[in-house]
Amino acid sequence: MMVEFAPLNTPLARCLQTAAVLQWVLSFLLLVQVCIGIMVMLVLYNYWFLYIPYLVWFYYDWRTPEQGGRRWNWVQSWPVWKYFKEYFPICLVKTQDLDPGHNYIFGFHPHGIFVPGAFGNFCTKYSDFKKLFPGFTSYLHVAKIWFCFPLFREYLMSNGPVSVSKESLSHVLSKDGGGNVSIIVLGGAKEALEAHPGTFTLCIRQRKGFVKMALTHGASLVPVFSFGENDLYKQINNPKGSWLRTIQDAMYDSMGVALPLIYARGIFQHYFGIMPYRKLIYTVVGRPIPVQQTLNPTSEQIEELHQTYLEELKKLFNEHKGKYGIPEHETLVFK
C-alpha cells in the first residue's frame, strides 16, 4: 500500500496544530531524559555555579507540588496550547452549575493515552473552564514521580499540575472559601493498558482513596467522562494472559509504569506514527454528589459513597453516549 503524504497546500493553522501536539507528545516521551541529560552534562563539565544552586533550590522546593504547585499564567497562555486544543479539538461540556462556595473532586475518566482531555481543559487558558465554572481554580493531580525529575518538574508545575499525594489533595480541599477543584484521573497509569478504540474499561473498583478524601474534607464528588479519549491511539492487542500483558503488568507492579505499545498517524502522513488521530474530545462534567464531612469515615461509609459514585458515573455515560456516536448497547466496564 502506497503511503500518501499530506498535501503541500495544507493550511498553516493545521500545520501549527500538528506542531503543537508533536511538542506535547515529545515532552511525554523525551523531555524527562533531556532534562536529566542536561543535569548530567552540567556535572560532568563542572558547571558548578549552575547545578549547585539549582540542586539547593530543588531540595528547598521539594514539597511545592504538594502545596498547590507553582503555575505560571504566562506559560498557560502560550499560543501553542491554543493550537494544541484545536488539533483534536477538545471541548468542555457542563451539565450543571457548581457552587463556588464549595470544593470539589472531579473524577476524570478514562485515562486513555497521555490524557490530552484533562490537560487541555484544566491546564491551559484556552479552555472554557473559567467561562463554564466562574470562581473556580482547577488543580490537575498527576503521579508524584513526575516531580522527582530535575528541570522537568519546573516545566510541569508551570502548567498547573500538582502531585496526587494525600498531602496535595488535602492542601487543595482544605482551602477556605471554596472554589477549588481537584481533578484526579482515577484509573491511573494502569488504565492506559485498557485504552483501545471503542472500549470503555475503567480501573476503578479498587480505587477508593479519593472517596475517603472527599468524606474527610466534605468535598463533593463529580464524575467526568471524556468521550473520544480512548480513540486517539491504537494499541497492540494485549488481552489478559497474553505474554505482552504479562510483561506490562509486571512492569507496572514493580515500577508503577505502564507502557502500552501504541501507534496512530505520522507527522506528514496518516498511516503510522506517534501523533494522535484528530478525534473530537468531549469532556462532560456530570452532576455533583453532595458529601457530608466525616473526619474518620468507616469502611462502610467509604464503600457506600464509592458505589454511589459508580452509579452516577454510569448514568453520565449512558445519558450522553448517544450524542457522541457511541452505540446504545455499549456500557462501562468496571475493573
UniProtKB/Swiss-Prot annotation:
Which EC number applies? 2.3.1.22
Give the way it sits in the membrane: Multi-pass membrane protein
Write out the entry's keywords from A to Z: Acyltransferase, Endoplasmic reticulum, Glycerol metabolism, Glycoprotein, Lipid biosynthesis, Lipid metabolism, Membrane, Transferase, Transmembrane, Transmembrane helix
| Pathway involvement of the protein, from the record | Glycerolipid metabolism; triacylglycerol biosynthesis
Localisation: Endoplasmic reticulum membrane
Q: Which InterPro entries match?
A: DAGAT
One GO term (biological process)? diacylglycerol biosynthetic process
* Expression by tissue: Expressed at high level in kidney and stomach. Expressed at lower level in brown and white adipose tissue, uterus and liver. Not detected in small intestine.
In which family does this protein belong, per the annotation? Belongs to the diacylglycerol acyltransferase family.
Q: What does this protein do?
A: Involved in glycerolipid synthesis and lipid metabolism. Catalyzes the formation of diacylglycerol, the precursor of triacylglycerol, by transferring the acyl chain of a fatty acyl-CoA to a monoacylglycerol, mainly at the sn-1 or sn-3 positions. It uses both sn-2-monoacylglycerol (2-acylglycerol) and sn-1-monoacylglycerol (1-acyl-sn-glycerol) equally well as substrates, and uses sn-3-monoacylglycerol (3-acyl-sn-glycerol) with lower efficiency. Probably not involved in absorption of dietary fat in the small intestine.
List the protein's name: 2-acylglycerol O-acyltransferase 1
This protein's species is: Mus musculus
